[in-house]
Regions:
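Conserved short "hinge" loops at termini or chain/domain junctions
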Residues: 1-73, 87-95, 99-100, 106-108, ...
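Low-complexity, serine/threonine/proline-enriched polar segments
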Residues: 125-127
């Protein structure tokens, strides 16, 4: 079965620090991973599957289109960045794992990458809070949101994903 991605390469490049010259193959898997981990957990299986099917069939309209463009795409853009950034400077080739460097630039430190990841997480959580507020007040527009059964993923309504600090 085909996988529907809720954002395009253009969405990611236009709304993040990812350069337009970056090869799609370097980050596309992080979009898919973030979509499956984060979006499905907030949508639940039934609504996630409905939106995926509509995207594949090119029939996404009305309230569902609004939900995707206003809430899900911004969430996914920033969740994908939290997944991609820690790996952005590495590549795995037949000779091993390599860290990229440039003659006229400086590689970001781990602390700098962690800072960027945290900022992207804050953006993602902001859009997620907006989504949760919207879907709670408008769940009647999306019957799939409340129709999960048995082994389906049930929608998560808790946005706080921050790490514990003791």
């Amino acid at each position: 079965m085909a996988t529907a991605l809720f954002i395009s390469r253009t969405d990611l490049v236009k709304n993040t620090i990812v350069s337009g010259a970056t090869d799609t193959d370097l980050f596309i898997q992080y979009v898919k991973i973030s979509q499956e981990i984060h979006l499905e957990s907030y949508l639940g299986s039934k609504l996630y599957d409905k939106i995926s099917a509509d995207i594949i069939a090119d029939t996404l309209t009305g309230d569902y289109l609004y939900l995707v463009t206003e809430f899900l795409q911004p969430m996914l853009i920033h969740y994908a960045m939290t997944s991609y950034l820690p790996f952005a400077s590495y590549s795995v080739k037949s000779g091993g794992i390599f860290k990229h460097s440039s003659e006229n630039s400086e590689t970001a430190s781990k602390d700098e990458v962690d800072f960027l990841v945290q900022k992207e997480r804050e953006f993602a959580e902001h859009y997620t809070r907006r989504f949760v507020d919207y879907i709670c007040f408008n769940s009647s527009k999306f019957p799939e949101y409340t129709s999960n059964k048995e082994s389906d993923v049930y929608p998560d309504k808790d946005v706080n994903s921050s790490n514990w600090v003791l």
